[in-house]
Amino acid sequence: MAFLTKGLKIVLRDERPQEPIEKTFHYEGGIKEFVEYLNRSTTPLYEQIIYCEGIVNNVSVEVAMQHNDSYNENSYGFVNNITTPEGVTHIVGFRNALTKTFNDYARKNKLLKDNEPNLTGEDIREGLTAIISVKIEDPQFEGQTK
């Protein structure tokens, strides 16, 4: 929760022991710090975490991502701070847009020849850590338990 809402401070205090224990969760960088945390046991391929945010039609979107030296993709989606399954629209849209952007860049800059096939999404997302956070009014979650 603290990663997903930059500036939010959550303080947990256990007063049961003689000496109370307190733990504070506060991440001013929000999802950028979340990506940094998830990549702590890997070596990033570039220093700066790619980050963008915007609001359109009362929908707020934040994306933070960074490639690392692992072979695994770790992309996580959230709607209103609730984790979402892998196949939801904002994750699929992010993956498709990322693949298209890489391929368009590669073609425009002659990194791929006209007769060569496009890069696959799996190749582009290898070693990728990404957080996609969407905030919307009146969300509808399939299978949501009340």
Predicted regions and their residues:
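GHKL/Histidine-kinase-like ATPase module
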Residues: K6-T145
